[in-house]
Design a protein with these regions (language model features):
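Short, conserved loop/helix-junction motifs that constitute active-site signature segments
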Residues: 32-36
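Flexible glycine/proline-rich, aromatic-decorated loop/lid segments
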Residues: 45-81
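Long, low-complexity segments enriched in small/aliphatic residues
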Residues: 117-217, 329
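Flexible loop/turn segments at secondary-structure boundaries
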Residues: 20-25, 30, 47-51, 65-68, ...
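Glycine-rich anion-binding loop/nest that anchors nucleotide
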Residues: 2-5, 9-29, 42, 46
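C-terminal substrate/ligand-recognition segments
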Residues: 2-10, 18-19, 195-204, 217-247
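Long, contiguous, secondary-structure-rich segments that constitute the structural scaffold
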Residues: 87-89, 93-145, 215-228, 235-346
């Protein structure tokens, strides 16, 4: 979609609790796409690097500031209850989306929900007869049982903790295996870029780090990114290592380990600023899933002069910028709550 924005095919975009300026590959191209939009709105509960580029920021609420249901990867549907009121003008995401539809007047009757419970009732109807069938789950039943597994096609059905235990969803009940043909990565190594760069996560941080980079204990545990390299590359622990790809370069302290391949380097991606890993990654897309090829691109390494800085999380105008870990240091102070988290900002 951001590529379509860059070409002018998409004119306006609303993002909900996402931060592509940190989490998506080839950050420079992502920035060009957002800058090409005629209108850009972000909905989030903390300001992010992507919010900083938006025309309008609408304050969303945290999960504990509303009630609803959540489905995890194993198919278990659980209910969460409201623990606190959202501050200021912050509102749940569903309310904001419905209100935008109402004010635009475009199929507003399709968004005439007054609670998250009403939205769940719509899901029960829409999923009836499908593989992920929620129709037998009631609001009260989910809460009283602590969770129900889909499919659950009737209110007296126990749910399905183990999917396909008796038969698979084919006429003969048997599984289907689909062998795939191996494809090389979109960007192969060569004489100029002889190594492979892969990116990933750390235990202390989550996704783009927009929440975890504000929590002192987590910043103290993992204050900044590094580059993991094999001893054969000739670096010592803590050396500044410059990683270069066809899109950009950044310099990190070396973490020298024997558990990584000799032809591969690894960088965690949760940070913004000059040390953002996704400055360097390739934005080639899988032809079927359209998922970017995050995990492999060609690179080279050389000894750097200084370690690049990370950027602290954005805060609203007027809020003190003393988020723990700002500027690359860590301390044990509690994170500063952005003032007026519920204030819409242009």
């Amino acid at each position: 979609m951001v590529h379509q924005a860059e070409s002018g095919e998409i004119k306006g975009l609303i993002g909900i609790c996402n931060n592509p300026l940190v989490s998506m590959p080839n950050r420079q191209r992502i920035a060009r796409g957002y800058d090409a939009l005629e209108f850009h709105c972000q909905i989030d509960f903390f300001l992010s690097e992507t919010c900083d580029r938006a025309d309008v920021v609408l304050p969303g609420s945290l999960w504990a500031e509303d009630e609803g249901v959540s489905t995890n990867a194993e198919g278990r549907v659980v209910k969460y209850n409201k623990a606190a009121e959202p501050p200021g003008e912050a509102r749940p995401d569903w309310w904001i989306v419905c209100e935008i539809a109402r004010r635009l007047g475009h199929h507003a009757d399709k968004f005439a929900f007054s609670s998250s419970r009403e939205i769940f009732e719509e899901l029960r109807v829409a999923s009836r007869g499908g593989l992920a069938d929620y129709s037998g789950m009631t609001w009260e039943r989910i809460e009283s049982t602590g969770g129900i597994f889909w499919p659950c096609p009737s209110e007296d059905h126990p749910g399905t903790p183990r999917l396909f235990e008796d038969r698979f969803a084919h006429g003969d009940g048997k599984a289907r295996f689909h062998p795939i043909e191996w494809r090389p990565p979109a960007e192969e190594v060569d004489a100029e870029y002889p190594l492979r760069l892969t990116t990933g996560r750390t235990v202390a941080h989550y996704l783009s780090g927009n929440q975890t980079r504000r929590i002192g204990a987590l910043v103290q545990q993992t204050p900044r990114p590094w580059v993991e390299v094999h001893p054969s590359l000739g670096f010592a622990e803590g050396d500044p290592v410059k990683v270069l790809t066809r899109r950009g370069a950044a310099t990190y302290p070396a973490l020298v380990v024997e558990t990584i391949r000799r032809d591969t380097v690894f960088i965690p991606y949760h940070w913004a600023g000059a040390a953002a890993a996704n400055i360097m990654t390739v934005d080639a897309l899988d032809p079927t899933s359209r998922i970017p090829e995050f995990k492999v691109c060609a690179c080279r390494v050389e000894r750097g002069e200084h370690i690049d800085a990370i950027a602290p999380p954005p805060v609203p105008p007027g809020a003190p910028p003393d988020i723990p870990g700002a500027g690359g240091f860590a301390d044990d102070r509690p994170p500063t709550a952005p003032q007026g988290r519920g204030t819409a900002e242009a």
